[in-house]
């Protein structure tokens, strides 16, 4: 493996064509798009999370009762159900889908596998280096030249600084072979660069890129907040089940958002003419008589 000398993450304006963005990701393992999400959208998203009382936190799940989460961090899930701004605006952001279309152009449809809203406070320790793709353990057996099946988007909703734990990224690490968990654990933070960003930027991460949240230093008194979206080829199962969403909420969504959350039939590229997530070999949406863009009561 080779660490680039004086590496820098490439940055692009939000008007940059998605194929150009994805080429940077293919070359370096990461790219940053600036000013991609309006600040007003972020502020209203924060209000949904903070004020509705519907946010669900991983730290509260019984399944994680034996896990030692840092007390300075919180991870909210169930964002589609919690936040109207997330499900109606962020999930329909054209740039996000242009990026995903470029990423999965040879694989067919894609969908949202997981969405997490993370907050860290002073004293939060640095994460261990990792690859997000290992949510699906089979992917660890892929070679660097194999088709990428996932893409992570990290969206700061407050500024990312070195002091408050900006994500550390190892450029070019998506091309490294034979990286065992032990090899990754042995990496030094000196091998990485900090992804300092403003609220509303988007960082695009290749599935094999090694990265970690940095340490939120005690003297950095601000709260760092971010939205982590994991999109995958529709050929991989979603982490968040579509069955958890009530139908009236689903029918308030756009057709695109319905597909993202698993309520429509998806089609991989190639010889599969039926699709996946079907209803009696027809489309799920037709079989269910699913409507879209409906006003949700209450």
From Swiss-Prot:
Coiled coil: none annotated. Its EC number is 1.14.-.-. Keywords: Dioxygenase, Iron, Metal-binding, Oxidoreductase. Iron/alpha-ketoglutarate-dependent dioxygenase; part of the gene cluster that mediates the biosynthesis of calidodehydroaustin, a fungal meroterpenoid. The first step of the pathway is the synthesis of 3,5-dimethylorsellinic acid by the polyketide synthase ausA. 3,5-dimethylorsellinic acid is then prenylated by the polyprenyl transferase ausN. Further epoxidation by the FAD-dependent monooxygenase ausM and cyclization by the probable terpene cyclase ausL lead to the formation of protoaustinoid A. Belongs to the PhyH family. In A.calidoustus, the austinoid gene cluster lies on a contiguous DNA region, while clusters from E.nidulans and P.brasilianum are split in their respective genomes. Genetic rearrangements provoked variability among the clusters and E.nidulans produces the least number of austionoid derivatives with the end products austinol and dehydroaustinol, while P.brasilianum can produce until acetoxydehydroaustin, and A.calidoustus produces the highest number of identified derivatives. Homodimer. Pathway: Secondary metabolite biosynthesis; terpenoid biosynthesis. GO terms for molecular function: dioxygenase activity; metal ion binding. Its cofactor is Fe cation. It is an enzyme of class 1 (oxidoreductase). This is Iron/alpha-ketoglutarate-dependent dioxygenase ausO. GO terms for biological process: terpenoid biosynthetic process. It comes from the Eukaryota. InterPro entries: Phytyl_CoA_dOase-like. Fe cation binds at residues 130, 132, 211.
């Amino acid at each position: 493996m080779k660490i680039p000398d004086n590496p820098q993450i490439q940055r692009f304006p939000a008007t940059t064509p998605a194929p150009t963005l994805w080429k940077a990701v293919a070359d370096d393992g990461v790219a940053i798009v600036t000013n991609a999400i309006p600040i007003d959208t972020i502020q209203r998203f924060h209000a949904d999370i903070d004020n509705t009382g519907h946010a669900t936190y991983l730290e509260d799940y019984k399944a994680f009762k034996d896990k030692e989460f840092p007390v300075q961090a919180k991870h909210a899930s169930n964002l589609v159900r919690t936040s109207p701004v997330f499900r109606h605006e962020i999930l329909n952001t054209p740039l996000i889908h242009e990026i995903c279309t470029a990423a999965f152009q040879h694989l067919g449809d894609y969908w949202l596998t997981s969405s997490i809203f993370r907050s860290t406070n002073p004293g939060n320790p640095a994460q261990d280096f990792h690859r997000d793709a290992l949510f699906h353990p089979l992917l660890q057996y892929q070679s660097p030249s194999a088709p990428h099946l996932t893409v992570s988007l990290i969206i700061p909703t407050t500024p990312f600084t070195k002091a408050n734990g900006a994500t550390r990224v190892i450029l070019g690490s998506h091309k490294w072979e034979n990286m065992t968990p032990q090899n990754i654990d042995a990496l030094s933070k000196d091998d990485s660069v900090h992804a300092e960003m403003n609220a509303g930027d988007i960082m695009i991460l290749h599935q094999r890129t090694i990265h970690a949240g940095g340490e939120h230093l005690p003297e950095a008194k601000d709260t760092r907040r971010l939205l982590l979206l994991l999109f995958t080829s529709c050929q991989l199962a979603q982490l968040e089940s579509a069955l958890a969403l009530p139908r009236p909420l689903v029918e308030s969504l756009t057709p695109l958002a319905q597909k993202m959350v698993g309520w429509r039939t998806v089609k991989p590229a190639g010889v599969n003419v039926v699709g996946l997530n079907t209803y009696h070999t027809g489309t799920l949406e037709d079989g269910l008589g699913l409507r879209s863009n409906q006003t949700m009561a209450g």
